[in-house]
UniProtKB/Swiss-Prot annotation:
Disulfide bonds join C41-C482, C58-C438, C131-C197, C290-C337, C510-C548. A motif (Internalization motif) lies at residues 822-825. It is found in: Virion membrane; Host cell membrane; Host endosome membrane; Host Golgi apparatus membrane. It comes from the Viruses. Residues 23-688 are virion surface. It comes from Human herpesvirus 6A (strain Uganda-1102). It is a single-pass type I membrane protein. This is Envelope glycoprotein B. Keywords: Disulfide bond, Glycoprotein, Host cell membrane, Host endosome, Host Golgi apparatus, Host membrane, Host-virus interaction, Membrane, Signal, Transmembrane, Transmembrane helix, Viral attachment to host cell, Viral envelope protein, Virion, Virus entry into host cell. Residues 98-104, 184-191 are annotated as: Involved in fusion and/or binding to host membrane.
Length: 830
């Protein structure tokens, strides 16, 4: 019978005994983990044989980097835009419609039209700082419309003067500060025409590949500023609108008008686009643009050579630049522009820093770094080393310590010392780590080899990081994979005492490992006995016994719990974290590197970044606002709203048809005029002068009323004296009416036109002047006759000619000449 058959028979018998004599209350469920599950590790016949290799050699680390000295110059890509001046020419027409009413003028439609200035007029601007006051517009049908400034029908020249509002990048010149406005006839519509020439000195920007350029005014030209008509540069604008002139003389700055300094432009372009004429100087692209720009010069540098690249190290910049080993040749004209500059820098640096102690080790080399920087490297070699290699005795005799102590050598030594110290520190640390690691691994392998003789499965499992079954076969190890059991079926028994076939526990014999029962995966649910080993390994059989030691306490680990057995009986289980860990791990301690203050490397400054943008939004908005404030703001507007009641009447009359609409218009205009008059009177009264005048007039009116009132009271008190003031005069004054010496009482006619009443005539000497009145009463007829006589007397006084009438009746000088020799005849005599 084979060994495996005997083993399985023993397991079957043990299972039968456990099923008969074991109580389920006498076992607990054992815990497990994923790293070390419950498993059975046995050695099969076909196993893998392995051994420990202890023949290991540890060699020290050595660096193979090659270092060389020198200095280098770094160029960066020029991201700044090509900036150049541009002039724009524009004529602005303003048509202002207005309606004049009584005391007010209403502004109606206002039309502003921009027209491009013709090239011949731009020549007048560039030579005399003037433009024409007329403009002609030709429509597609051939019709020509003309407009004149201030509607004077004259084509004069207008002088340009600077606008008050200007920005840093733009200067504008105009001819009309405020639009012209003429007051039309009363109650009629009229239109005023104003012309303004606008010339702007702006700044344009173009970015590589220069397919367009933008002005600081916000305008764009779709074409290269270097296009001359035949060089093949990109130009998308209509060529018929482009005019190119050579050897052009123009005023450089219009600020001084026609007295400004002139300059000769080799080639200038005029482009008419929309409502603006543009002009700019055409230059050669290779002469005006350089695609590279000097960034920095590292006067003390090192170059480390690796397998495929060079490392250019700078202590000044605290940076290293990596570049392929292949050098470059600058052939593009936009890049060869830096050749004269960097050759000059190389000579200056060498003469100022290295002329006494170093020599140039060959010519300069050009590299392109991984950051697209152009690096010009100039290698150096110490003169002492160079002369030593050449074997020159003369040079050896001229060696002087003073040359070594020069300032430039000290700077280089400091840099070299810093680099060497850093390199040696890192290389020594890495070398020591590598050698120590190698020696530690060698010793560890030796220890594992010796420990594998005691517990081969534990050693091999730790090496592989998973449970492995191992057995020592002579000088080699036989390993195999463990068989995992059903993890949920494993149960740990509480008692460690041996039970005989009759189910009686022994008092002297105990198991040295706890008993477990389990079942296999994907098999019959029969229970198999075993014993708990290390790291959840299940040992088949129950033959591992010992004599019971009383008292005793044993702790066995299973999964995440520690099971405590006191006197071979389970008492409690505790988490494995409650047991303190014996820390046998040795940590590696390395001193940190010394401090290194790194500089912030700004490849492009903020000014360069701002100049890299073609569109400068800030300047465009500033230009727009200043231009709007200067040209398109009317200082004052006179606007009077039509009264609401007039609109109501007009709406009512519109419902009456055409007649009502016309009548409503007349009423609206009339009401508006009356409203304007009333408003003017109210405004006059609100004025201090008008208010004072009205106060004086009120005082005069009050005085007049008082005088009239007093006179009226006097009339009421003495009516005869007030009505007939001449009645109080002496009687002799009456004779002056007739011109005789007697009192002649005129005849008084009846009211009905009857005969007159006779009045006696008396001589002057016989007149009754006593003034006495008879006491006899008068009849009504006598009173009536007296009133008629008084009336007749009053009329005679009123018919008396006044002095002004007599003066007016006096003949004039012409009449006297004309009627000389004649004598005027009295009317009464006639």
């Amino acid at each position: 019978m084979s060994k495996m058959a005997v083993l399985f028979l023993a397991v079957f018998l043990m299972n039968s005994v456990l099923m008969i004599y074991c109580d389920p209350d006498h076992y607990i469920r054992a815990g497990y983990n994923h790293k070390y599950p419950f498993r059975i590790c046995s050695i099969a016949k076909g196993t893998d044989l392995m051994r420990f290799d202890r023949d290991i050699s540890c060699s020290p680390y050595k660096s193979n980097a090659k270092m060389s000295e020198g200095f280098f110059i770094i160029y960066k890509t020029n991201i700044e835009t090509y900036t150049f001046p541009v002039r724009t020419y524009k004529k602005e027409l303003t048509f202002q419609s207005s309606y004049r009413d009584v005391g007010v003028v209403y502004f109606l439609d206002r039309t502003v039209m921009g027209l491009a200035m013709p090239v011949y007029e731009a020549n007048l601007v560039n030579s005399h700082a003037q433009c024409y006051s007329a403009v002609a517009m030709k429509r597609p049908d051939g019709t020509v419309f003309s407009a004149f400034h201030e509607d004077n029908n004259k084509n004069n020249t207008l002088n340009l003067f600077p606008l008050n509002f200007k920005s840093i990048t733009n200067k504008r010149f105009i001819t009309t500060k405020e639009p012209y406005f003429a007051r039309g006839p009363l109650w009629l519509y009229s239109t005023s025409t104003s012309l303004n020439c606008i010339v702007t000195e702006a700044t344009a920007k173009a970015k590589y590949p220069f397919s367009y350029f933008a002005l600081t005014t916000g305008e764009i030209v779709e074409g290269s500023p270097f296009f001359n008509g035949s060089n093949g540069k990109h130009f998308a604008e209509p060529l018929e609108k482009l005019t190119i002139l050579e050897n052009y003389t123009m005023i450089e700055d219009l600020m001084n008008g026609m007295n400004g300094a002139t300059t000769l432009v080799r080639k200038i372009a005029f482009l008419e686009k929309a409502d603006t004429l543009f002009s700019w100087e055409i230059k050669e692209e290779n002469e005006s643009v350089c695609m590279l720009k000097h960034w920095t010069t590292v006067t003390h540098g090192l170059r480390a050579e690796t397998n495929e690249t060079y490392h250019f190290i700078s202590k000044e910049l605290t940076a290293a630049f990596v570049a392929p080993k292949e050098s470059l040749n600058l052939t593009d004209p936009k890049q060869t522009c830096i050749k004269n500059e960097f050759e000059k820098i190389i000579n200056e640096v060498y003469m100022s820093d290295y002329n006494d102690t170093y020599s140039m080790n060959g010519s300069y080399q050009i590299f392109k770094t991984t950051g697209d920087l152009i690096l010009i490297w100039q290698p150096l070699v110490q003169k002492s080393l160079m002369f030593l290699e050449q074997g020159s005795e003369k040079i050896r005799r001229r060696r002087d310590v003073g040359d070594v102590k020069s300032r430039h050598d000290i700077l280089y030594v400091q840099l070299q010392y810093l680099y060497d110290t850093l390199k040696d520190y890192i290389n020594d640390a890495l070398g020591n780590l590598a050698e120590s690691w190698c020696l530690d691994q060698k010793r560890t392998i030796t220890m594992l080899h010796e420990l594998s003789k005691i517990s081969p499965s534990s050693i091999v499992s730790e090496v592989y990081g998973r449970p492995i079954s191992a057995q020592l076969h002579g000088d080699v190890l036989a390993i195999s994979k463990c068989i995992e059991v059903n993890q949920s079926s494993v149960q740990l028994h509480k008692s460690m005492r041996v039970v005989d076939a009759k189910g009686v526990r022994s008092e002297t014999m105990c198991y040295n490992r706890p008993l477990v029962t389990f079942s296999f995966v994907n098999s019959t649910p029969e229970v198999v006995p075993g014993q708990l080993g290390l790291d959840n390994e299940i040992l088949l059989g129950d033959h591992r016994t010992e004599e019971c030691e009383i008292p005793s306490t044993k702790i066995f680990l299973s999964g995440n719990h520690a099971h405590v057995y006191t006197d071979y009986t389970h008492t409690n289980s505790t988490p494995i974290e409650d047991i303190e860990v014996l820390d046998a791990f040795i940590r590696l301690k390395i001193d940190p590197l010394e401090n290194a203050d790194f500089k912030v490397l700004d490849l492009y400054s903020p000014d360069e970044l701002s100049r890299a943008n073609v569109f400068d939004l800030e300047n465009i908005l500033r230009e727009y606002n200043s231009y709007k404030s200067a040209l398109y703001t009317i200082e004052a507007k006179i606007a009077t709203n039509t009264p609401s009641y007039v609109n109501g009447i007009n709406s009512f009359l519109q419902g009456l048809g055409a007649i009502g609409t016309g009548l409503g218009s007349v009423i609206s205009v009339t009401a508006g005029a009356l409203g304007d008059i009333v408003g003017g009177v109210v405004s006059f009264l609100k004025n201090p002068f008008g208010g004072g005048l009205m106060l004086i007039l009120a005082i005069v009116v009050v005085v007049i009323i008082i005088v009239v009132f007093v006179r009226q009271r006097h009339v009421l008190s003495k009516p005869i004296d007030m009505m007939f003031p001449y009645a109080t005069n002496p009687v002799t004054t009456v004779s002056s009416v007739t011109g005789t010496t007697v009192v002649k009482t005129p005849s008084v006619k009846d009211v009905d036109g009857g005969t007159s009443v006779a009045v006696s005539e008396k001589e002057e000497g016989m007149a009754d002047v006593s003034g006495q009145v008879s006491d006899d009463e008068y009849s009504q007829e006598d009173a009536l006759k007296m009133l008629k006589a008084i009336k007749s007397l009053d009329e005679s006084y009123r018919r008396k000619p006044s002095s002004s009438e007599s003066h007016a009746s006096k003949p004039s000088l012409i009449d006297r000449i004309r009627y000389r020799g004649y004598k005027s005849v009295n009317v009464e005599e006639a």
